[in-house]
Amino acid sequence: MIVSGGQNIYPAEVENAICRHPKVASAVVVGVPDDDLGHRAHALIQAADGTTAQEILDFLADELVRYKIPRSVEFIDRPLRDDAGKVRRSQMREDAIERMRNNA
């Protein structure tokens, strides 16, 4: 669970909503630090070429209440699950935070 600005966000609920988009193959949602909210939802998505973050966010506006929509979206080319089909969420979270620091 991600606590963002006092609101509870359940990653599985957000992931399921993202995966309903016709161009999305897979999604993982992790919590990343946020100066204002404590944490915020960050989506890692495998999608068809040409899919934009805005396209995903517009789609989610009809699927989720506003506070559950990820504040950031990152498209990933590599598989989001390991060979056993498991998501290594803590490792993905740390990798995402590191990429954000490097891009800041």
What are the language-model segments listed below?
Residues I2, L80, V87, M92:
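Short clusters of hydrophobic/aromatic residues that line enzyme substrate/ligand-binding pockets
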Residues A17, D36, I76, A84-G85, ...:
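Intrinsically disordered, low-complexity regions of eukaryotic proteins
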Residues Q54, R89-A104:
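AMP-dependent adenylate-forming
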